[in-house]
Amino acid sequence: MTPKTKLPQHKSGEFRTKNSRGNNQVKAEPASPPRIIGGDLKGRRLAFWPGGPTRPMKDRVREMTFDLLGTAVRGATVVNLFAGTGALGFEALSRGARRAIFAERHFPTADYLRRSSRELGLVDRVDIIPGDVLLWSRRMPPLSTESPWIIFVSPPWKFFHTRLA
């Protein structure tokens, strides 16, 4: 039996880097409001709480993800678990997804998802499920078989840290 490895603790808005001597350092990087990078809503910003617990996925990572998915997004139903800013789901809607389901356990962040859906004019294509994401995913209603599904799971760092500690 192997002992559990103690993972380094990260604070919101920080990441680890190595300096020229190979020592780990924590460097704060300010989070900026996420924007949609492709599709019909390209350039539009999402509602974002800069002091909140959410750290948006980098534009470049999202761009590579959607480059890999290509046209598979068109007409799909997207499920965005641990939605945070909803950047993945809103990006998919901008690129032609039929609808998006956002599950977010942090209630104030879920309110920001509602705000983004209103500001982007997507209220009729979005369902927001606030509460325990894992519990909801176990009881998730059956998804329609009329369209393909794409499921994004992007939990916060603290989620893994608390599960492995």
What are these regions (language model features)?
Residues 1-165:
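Class I S-adenosyl-L-methionine-dependent methyltransferase catalytic core
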